[in-house]
């Protein structure tokens, strides 16, 4: 099961969408690391929002996500567009990775109920699949050669 599919499997109960704001969860779900952004994951579709510095890389590397540039528009409007387009009413979020000010902004501006969901979202990252372990082995071999 790919990482995005794992996130999608969380959508059968309490929430019908996930708001991924931490770099760790975005990297895990998209299987590609982009320093800035946010993502919404729903069964109806997945969108990844980032700015123009990363847009080309995101468009070329993010499988399973529609990539949207936030420049000149802003995250809240685009997130609300996704919430409306995908019919999201209850959005799970990563409370461990938001400041109080960020959470207050999301609560004020997003058109969906926000439900703390960090435990569920981050739970998958601790268990590695064979392909992830192989990538870690290759990275370690490269590091070993660099220091040899």
Regions found by a protein language model. Give the residues of each.
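Terminal domain-start leader segments
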Residues: 1-49, 76-87, 108-114, 148
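Flexible, acidic/His-enriched mid-domain "rim/lid" segments that flank
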Residues: 2-4, 76-148
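Small/polar loops that bind or transfer phosphate-bearing groups
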Residues: 20, 71, 94-95
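Short, polar loop motifs at secondary-structure junctions
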Residues: 23-25, 50-56, 97-103
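Residue-level signal for pocket-adjacent positions within structured domains
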Residues: 27, 53, 119-122
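Compact, glycine/acidic-enriched structural inserts
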Residues: 50-81
């Amino acid at each position: 099961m790919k990482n995005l599919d794992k996130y999608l499997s969380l959508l059968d109960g309490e929430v019908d969408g996930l708001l991924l704001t931490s770099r760790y969860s975005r990297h895990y779900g998209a299987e590609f690391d982009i320093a800035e952004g946010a993502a919404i994951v729903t069964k109806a579709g997945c969108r990844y929002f980032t700015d123009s510095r990363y847009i080309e890389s995101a468009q070329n590397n993010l499988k399973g996500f529609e990539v949207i540039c936030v420049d000149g528009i802003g995250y809240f409007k685009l997130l609300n567009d996704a919430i409306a387009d995908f019919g999201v009413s209850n959005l799970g979020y990563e409370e461990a990775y938001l400041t109080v000010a960020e959470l207050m902004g999301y609560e004020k501006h997003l058109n969906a109920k926000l439900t703390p969901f960090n435990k569920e979202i981050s739970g998958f990252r601790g268990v590695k699949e064979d392909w992830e372990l192989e990538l870690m082995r290759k990275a370690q071999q490269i590091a070993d050669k660099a220091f040899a």
